[in-house]
A protein has these predicted regions:
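Right-handed parallel beta-helix/beta-solenoid
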Residues: 75-80, 96-101, 117-122, 138-143, ...
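Conserved hydrophobic beta-strand positions in leucine-rich repeat
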Residues: 39-44, 61-65, 82-86, 103-107, ...
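Consensus "Asn ladder" position of solenoid repeat domains
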Residues: 46, 68, 89, 110, ...
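Glycine-centered tight turns that cap/initiate beta-strands
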Residues: 56-59, 80, 90, 101, ...
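Short stretches within intrinsically disordered, low-complexity N-terminal or propeptide regions
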Residues: 103, 122-124, 170
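N-terminal capping/linker segments that flank leucine-rich repeat
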Residues: 2-62, 79, 142, 153-177
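A generic tandem-repeat structural signature
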Residues: 66-74, 78-93, 99-109
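Canonical leucine-rich repeat
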Residues: 49-54, 73-75, 94-96, 115-117, ...
Length: 177
């Protein structure tokens, strides 16, 4: 029964990518069975506007969706995700809630005004440069975090721990606590 439940894709470019790489039985459709076998998805620069079905790929450990036309990305069901590159999109909000395994995040060159890292306790590498962030709290992240927050013209304050390495523009105050 599980093998015969198929995913309906809203975005033709995302569907084409998935069919090209994950259609195990070559029937021209992606079943939930096929989706749950996918651990890595590398789909940069493919003109993808929506990945609304990304939650069906719940065993994903790595996702590279950089250089597309994404405005949002709902990863709440992708709780095993360790590496995420969603840079060079138009994402205004990124919900990382529940992504406790996330080690690397590249969300540079988007339209982010807020980046909530409360659930990102394992995060070791962050590039959030080139956004519209106003404040950034890195304290919930790994004490070995390396972060690049440059190119955020509205960023006034970054909160971090003494053991974390943070780079930001000269107008940004870095407060160590």
């Amino acid at each position: 029964l599980f093998r015969s439940v198929y995913i309906t894709f809203a975005d033709p470019a995302f569907e084409a990518y998935c069919l090209e790489h994950f259609d195990i039985d070559h029937d021209g459709r992606i079943s939930r069975y096929e989706a749950q076998r996918v651990l890595k998805m590398d789909c940069p620069d493919r003109g993808i506007a929506h990945m609304w079905e990304i939650g069906e790929f719940s065993r994903l450990e790595r996702l590279d969706g950089s250089g597309n036309d994404l405005t949002q990305l709902d990863l709440r069901k992708c709780t095993l995700l360790q590496t995420l590159d969603c840079s060079r999109n138009r994402i205004a909000s990124l919900d990382l809630d529940g992504l406790r395994a996330l080690l690397e995040l590249n969300c540079a060159d988007n339209a982010l005004t807020l980046l909530d890292l409360k659930s990102a306790g394992a995060l070791r590498l962050l590039d959030c440069s080139g956004n519209r962030l106003v404040t950034l709290d890195l304290r919930p992240c790994s004490e070995r975090l390396k972060a690049d927050a440059g190119g955020n013209p509205l960023l006034t304050t970054v909160y971090c721990r003494a053991s974390q390495s943070v780079s930001a523009d000269g107008h940004t105050e870095i407060i160590v606590r």
